[in-house]
Amino acid sequence: MSKYKRIFTIVIDSLGIGAMNDSEKYGDVNVDTLGHIAESVDTFNIPNLQKMGIANLHPIKHVAPVENPIGYQAKMAEASVGKDTMTGHWEMMGLHITKPFKTFTDTGFPQELLDELTARTGHKIVGNKSASGTEILDELGEHQIATGDMIVYTSADSVLQICGQEETFGLEELYRCCEIARELTLKDEWKVGRIIARPYLGTKKGEFKRTSNRHDYALKPYGRTVLNELKDNNFDVISVGKIKDIFDGEGITEGNKSKSSVHGMEQTLEIMDRDFTGFCFVNLVDFDALWGHRRNPQGYAEELEKFDVNLGKVLEKLHEDDLLIITADHGNDPTYTGTDHTREYVPFLAYSPSMKGHGQLETPKTFATIGATIADNFGLKMPEGTIGESVLNKLV
């Protein structure tokens, strides 16, 4: 019989807790997402994360370590090469990424790809560079509305993003163009992790706003993950936020899209009221998209404080046979240069009301510790070719 009937894993997207040993290879020197956020604000109040021992793992200004944190804490290292969303989440579920996804941050996309995309979609392409979503809209939104040209851009991540004004370009047309882009970028030399449809509203510079009709077209995971094992063995696998997109639906029994990170937590609280057996996997993207990439430590701190209030409600709702894991998929230090993710350790905070003990675990060498622990709990073997060692027997 399973030790825990339900396991909830909440990914605070981009909440790194200090540079990994190899971070300089990734151009990241002395990065520290959580530490630097706390240093950037006058007050920082996260009592529930504090109670779970986050400040025992890592020094945080304004947040003292606690003598008896609830549950268990660890600093997790990433085994895979990369510091992006897909690599982080796929590794959590057991995959070891040894070849990084293609990025076009410095060069833009090859002309040959753009020519094919124009031929197949019927739209001229503008942009073709790395930019933030707000910048590219201010620069080219009015042009798109006037001409019907397609705004294509990238970021430090392995993504090809296409913007479309919902009323003039049209949502269905945007999705059609993205499906064509996904098909074209399955070639090895153009293989990006995700195509992202970026719809927006507004008619002039300074007024453009992205809508919640974003859609991701991810690569399928290259191998079976813990999610497949759970689904194939009739366990519920409920996703919240962009998890379903990240895994291209593989191993998911129910997907819930979120309008924001606060909405994602509200959805999680609703799911906690339901009777199910299995895994609820939650991604809260606003930390990364709104505050990390935009280098806004104050906004990030406020978002964490809002999250912490809802975390308190989650802790109250946990059953004796529930396990909660709080983690992140990479760093994104909002005080660092540029707009890229940062290569950092991430927190592993695990708590169940049935735990008698508490304390710090040794640093796991891979995010796949999470997937291995989940598989172990439900009596499943890790899929062939995956990595990760369970810490289930240490959660007592």
UniProtKB/Swiss-Prot annotation:
Give one GO biological process term: nucleotide metabolic process
What residues bind Mn(2+) 2, as annotated?
A: D288, H293, H341
What are the names of the required cofactors?
Mn(2+)
Q: What is its main location?
A: cytoplasm
Which pathway, metabolic or otherwise, does it act in? Carbohydrate degradation; 2-deoxy-D-ribose 1-phosphate degradation; D-glyceraldehyde 3-phosphate and acetaldehyde from 2-deoxy-alpha-D-ribose 1-phosphate: step 1/2
Highest rank taxon of the organism: Bacteria
Reaction catalysis annotation: 2-deoxy-alpha-D-ribose 1-phosphate = 2-deoxy-D-ribose 5-phosphate; alpha-D-ribose 1-phosphate = D-ribose 5-phosphate
In terms of SUPFAM superfamilies, this protein maps to:
Alkaline phosphatase-like, DeoB insert domain-like
Recorded hits in CDD domains, A to Z, give: PPM
Molecular functions (GO terms): magnesium ion binding; manganese ion binding; phosphopentomutase activity
Residues binding Mn(2+) 1, per UniProt: D13, D329, H330
Query: Pfam families, per this entry?
Result: Metalloenzyme
**What InterPro entries does its record include?**
Alkaline_phosphatase_core_sf (IPR017850), DeoB (IPR010045), Metalloenzyme (IPR006124), Phosphopentomutase_DeoB_cap_sf (IPR024052)
Function of the protein: Isomerase that catalyzes the conversion of deoxy-ribose 1-phosphate (dRib-1-P) and ribose 1-phosphate (Rib-1-P) to deoxy-ribose 5-phosphate (dRib-5-P) and ribose 5-phosphate (Rib-5-P), respectively.
Give the record's family classification: Belongs to the phosphopentomutase family.
Name this polypeptide is given: Phosphopentomutase
Species name for this entry?
Answer: Clostridium perfringens (strain ATCC 13124 / DSM 756 / JCM 1290 / NCIMB 6125 / NCTC 8237 / Type A)
The beginning of the lineage is:
Bacteria, Bacillati, Bacillota, Clostridia, Eubacteriales
